[in-house]
């Protein structure tokens, strides 16, 4: 009986941190969307680590806060109304996680179209806050 109880406690100990990480990461994603929709691209960039790398489709890698801010500002001229849906968060330890999700957004112009895709983010905990360390996405389902 003692082994069963210890086993249950062990499994709960593994599940609880992962679900807490997911909730914290989803909260940062909500903040990312809020900043983007307000046009606060310095705010968006502040959610990335200082040495973050963004790998946008069909473009060169983007590194560092200033370049990430400029990239999102330029992107917002063409698209808006982003929606992020976390599908899975895998803990990589107490200060790192991997997120897989999907997104949708709308193109700007006379005939806006919805664009959908998928993404992977590697998260790092910096000073108690989750930050995007590597961010890659592409379109399609």
PLM region spans:
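Solvent-exposed loop/turn segments at secondary-structure junctions
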Residues: 41, 51, 59-61, 105-106, ...
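Short beta-strand edge/turn micro-motifs at domain boundaries
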Residues: 116-141
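Short, low-complexity N-terminal intrinsically disordered segments enriched in polar/charged residues
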Residues: 4, 8-50
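Surface-exposed, charged secondary-structure patches
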Residues: 69-111
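A short gly/proline-enriched turn/hairpin at secondary-structure junctions
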Residues: 47, 52-63, 73-79
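Hydrophobic pocket/interface hotspot
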Residues: 32, 44-45, 52, 64, ...
